[in-house]
């Protein structure tokens, strides 16, 4: 699986959690905002939740979240978005590949369940 070296994931932490990222008004009914994503990451911390800021080069362009689901023997790929200013450039596809690579490298599960809220 080829991954764009300009895309990287950084764990959400005390220095980056306030980065202002959002989707367009039309997309808000379908995508959790940054605050709700962080709340879900906190709520699922016992399920090894992993919340990431997605960077293209050194620019934050989006966020993603997944966590373990032992009852389904899978990772739940719960939240993902690319900021409206950076959509349409293939960054979401590349970042998704990188998240899936992280899951594969972790190796706990062989299955991914997509969550649609």
Spans of model-derived segments:
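Conserved GNAT acetyl-CoA-binding A-motif
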Residues: 105-116
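Acetyl-CoA-dependent GNAT
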Residues: 2-78, 83-85, 96-98, 102, ...
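Glycine-rich acyl-CoA binding loop
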Residues: 88-93
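Aromatic-flanked redox-active Cys/Sec active sites in thiol-based oxidoreductases
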Residues: 82, 116-117
């Amino acid at each position: 699986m080829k991954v764009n070296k300009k895309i990287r994931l950084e764990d959400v932490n005390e220095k980056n959690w306030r980065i202002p990222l959002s989707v367009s008004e039309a997309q808000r009914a379908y995508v959790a905002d940054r605050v709700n994503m962080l709340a879900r990451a906190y709520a699922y911390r016992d399920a090894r939740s992993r919340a990431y800021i997605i960077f293209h080069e050194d620019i934050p362009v989006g966020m993603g979240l997944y966590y373990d689901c032992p009852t389904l023997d899978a990772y739940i790929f719960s939240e993902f978005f690319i900021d409206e200013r950076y959509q349409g450039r293939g960054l979401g596809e590349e970042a998704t590949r990188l998240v899936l690579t992280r899951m594969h490298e972790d190796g706990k599960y062989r299955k991914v369940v997509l969550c649609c809220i």
